[in-house]
Amino acid sequence: MTSFAALGDSITLGVGDPVRPARLAGPAVAAGPAVVAGQSPGRGWRGWAALLAEGLNEPGLHILAVNGACMADVERDQLPRALQLRPDIASVVVGVNDTLRGNFDPDRFAAAAGHTVGALRAAGAEVLTMRLPDPGRMLGVPGVLARPLARRARQLNLVMDTVAERFGTLHFDAAGDAETYDPRMWAADRLHPSERGHRLIARRYHGLLAAAGYQVGPPPNAEPTSRPPTRLAELTWLATKGTAWVLRRSTDLVPGLLAMAVTEWRSGRGHGLPPDGDTEWRPGPGHDPRPDVDLAGERWPG
């Protein structure tokens, strides 16, 4: 049996890919539901991790992801549970919530990411990681707010690139994948993948695992099996749940982004995004994205 532990946030929970629980057939779920409770009676979320698990060899799927999780939450709460499972494969897909927080700190993110991925690799797991797309671009926010979000996304992606290189993860570049920005890939909130988007993520990881020599079955189908929401349904969501989400975030995120925008304007950076190579992040003292010592007590090279 191939044991798969899925760590992360609502993307890994499957938000945006609603199904009725009876429709999900495939991997045995040893910890955590493969269909997570959804927003309406009798419905839940499936998502890319469950879709990917269907193509693995006799999979045992452990969904440890938690809605709203940041990287520090994954390190503190999900990593210990994952290490107890000693999975063959583990995914660490998280970061969007970090970019949307007023207390954003790339150094703390780097330390937590390095410890989490390093510990899983030291325990023998193949680790799946991701470069995340720019949330400001997906949300379509005004440029004055989009620029700080873009910088945050690039900083976190640099961290994950560094972590992926040092620990040898299977790293999916969702930020650079042209299909990522197809509107059909996104749910009404524009922060979570639609069923089509979850299928894209599952297919990309399926390809990476196959290239790494894993015995995998056929890749998940690219085409959705459920009818996509109507434009009316999307507008209804945005006018009800979406508005509530914005109001909850406005006391935390928006003031912070506005302050960043003012700072950028004063420094002359507020008229465009940095070039791709200008991420403006270097690890601070004590925040190199790797643990000093692995689980066997040996220092990591570097």
Model-identified regions with their sequence ranges:
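Serine-esterase "nucleophile elbow" of acetyl-processing enzymes
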Residues: 1-67, 79-86, 294-296, 301
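Oxyanion-hole/transition-state-stabilizing segment in secreted/luminal serine hydrolases
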Residues: 13-19, 71-108, 134-135
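A short helix->loop->beta-strand "cap" motif at the edges of active sites that frequently abuts
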Residues: 122-127
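Conserved catalytic region of serine esterases and O-acyltransferases that act on ester linkages
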Residues: 166, 189-192, 196-302
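Generic structural signal for well-ordered alpha-helices
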Residues: 113-117, 157
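Alpha-helix N-cap and loop-to-helix initiation/capping positions
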Residues: 40-44, 104-109, 144-155, 189, ...
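Substrate-gating cap/lid alpha-helix
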Residues: 137-174, 195
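Residue-level recognition of beta-strand->loop/alpha-helix junctions
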Residues: 65, 131, 173-176
